[in-house]
């Protein structure tokens, strides 16, 4: 997707058990190296005008072979929370901004107690896991679900507006999280070991693969093209001058040899008549 900037993962971070021990960068797909667990991508937009609706987020994930995030259990919820915590480390420029997940309600105007049961996952998952904020879902015209991410907001009745879920109008503009099937034999993966928890596991060492690094080099190479051209021109000019001087010396040497006169006295007596 053109509006998602693909960036490389940052350096590994030190952390304790249960934390996702790596700086997570917006637009970077993160995969487990055992290729048995899902991959994820956090799509964060600093500019509010670049954020997307629920349907746009859903289509963006599907266009890359993924789905809008579904959560199977609390372990997977905690994993996503850890990734978001590393996404918002000081200095990254990432702050407030909720994230679309794939939960939504197909129906209009339900406000009864049965409303929470009408929510379903857009990828077809049968997971019944929910992590609603206090007094949510509010139903009515709010049919699509976000994961709260408001670290600078004052706590509400249910505590800080972090990681719990809230239903919102589907045309509102937010960030989003994609989920992908485990990658099989990915192209040129770069593996770096560090500690993390897999969904459903506890305190286990895992190697995570950084996917999509080669395409991201485009963002590094393109800005350097003018400099590379300048260096190439300077190098070519230098080589031309050296070659020209070398040819000048080569031409001078034979001319000098033709003007050389022997100091020996020629014997011409034999030529007298």
Swiss-Prot record:
<dbReference type="GO" id="GO:0005829">
    <property type="term" value="C:cytosol"/>
</dbReference>
<keyword id="KW-0256">Endoplasmic reticulum</keyword>
<dbReference type="InterPro" id="IPR001304">
    <property type="entry name" value="C-type_lectin-like"/>
</dbReference>
<feature type="transmembrane region" description="Helical">
    <location>
        <begin position="217"/>
        <end position="237"/>
    </location>
</feature>
<dbReference type="GO" id="GO:0007399">
    <property type="term" value="P:nervous system development"/>
</dbReference>
<protein>
    <recommendedName>
        <fullName>Chondrolectin</fullName>
    </recommendedName>
</protein>
<feature type="signal peptide">
    <location>
        <begin position="1"/>
        <end position="21"/>
    </location>
</feature>
<dbReference type="Pfam" id="PF00059">
    <property type="entry name" value="Lectin_C"/>
</dbReference>
<comment type="subunit">
    <text>Interacts with RABGGTB.</text>
</comment>
<dbReference type="InterPro" id="IPR016186">
    <property type="entry name" value="C-type_lectin-like/link_sf"/>
</dbReference>
<keyword id="KW-0430">Lectin</keyword>
<keyword id="KW-0325">Glycoprotein</keyword>
<keyword id="KW-0963">Cytoplasm</keyword>
<dbReference type="GO" id="GO:0005789">
    <property type="term" value="C:endoplasmic reticulum membrane"/>
</dbReference>
<dbReference type="GO" id="GO:0030246">
    <property type="term" value="F:carbohydrate binding"/>
</dbReference>
<dbReference type="GO" id="GO:0005813">
    <property type="term" value="C:centrosome"/>
</dbReference>
<comment type="function">
    <text>May play a role in the development of the nervous system such as in neurite outgrowth and elongation. May be involved in motor axon growth and guidance.</text>
</comment>
<feature type="topological domain" description="Extracellular">
    <location>
        <begin position="22"/>
        <end position="216"/>
    </location>
</feature>
<feature type="compositionally biased region" description="Polar residues">
    <location>
        <begin position="251"/>
        <end position="263"/>
    </location>
</feature>
<feature type="domain" description="C-type lectin">
    <location>
        <begin position="35"/>
        <end position="179"/>
    </location>
</feature>
<feature type="disulfide bond">
    <location>
        <begin position="61"/>
        <end position="178"/>
    </location>
</feature>
<keyword id="KW-0732">Signal</keyword>
<feature type="glycosylation site" description="N-linked (GlcNAc...) asparagine">
    <location>
        <position position="86"/>
    </location>
</feature>
<keyword id="KW-1015">Disulfide bond</keyword>
<keyword id="KW-0472">Membrane</keyword>
<keyword id="KW-1133">Transmembrane helix</keyword>
<dbReference type="InterPro" id="IPR051505">
    <property type="entry name" value="C-type_lectin_domain"/>
</dbReference>
<dbReference type="GO" id="GO:0050772">
    <property type="term" value="P:positive regulation of axonogenesis"/>
</dbReference>
<keyword id="KW-0812">Transmembrane</keyword>
<dbReference type="GO" id="GO:0005737">
    <property type="term" value="C:cytoplasm"/>
</dbReference>
<keyword id="KW-0524">Neurogenesis</keyword>
<feature type="region of interest" description="Disordered">
    <location>
        <begin position="248"/>
        <end position="273"/>
    </location>
</feature>
<feature type="disulfide bond">
    <location>
        <begin position="144"/>
        <end position="170"/>
    </location>
</feature>
<dbReference type="InterPro" id="IPR016187">
    <property type="entry name" value="CTDL_fold"/>
</dbReference>
<feature type="topological domain" description="Cytoplasmic">
    <location>
        <begin position="238"/>
        <end position="273"/>
    </location>
</feature>
<dbReference type="GO" id="GO:0048471">
    <property type="term" value="C:perinuclear region of cytoplasm"/>
</dbReference>
<dbReference type="GO" id="GO:0007517">
    <property type="term" value="P:muscle organ development"/>
</dbReference>
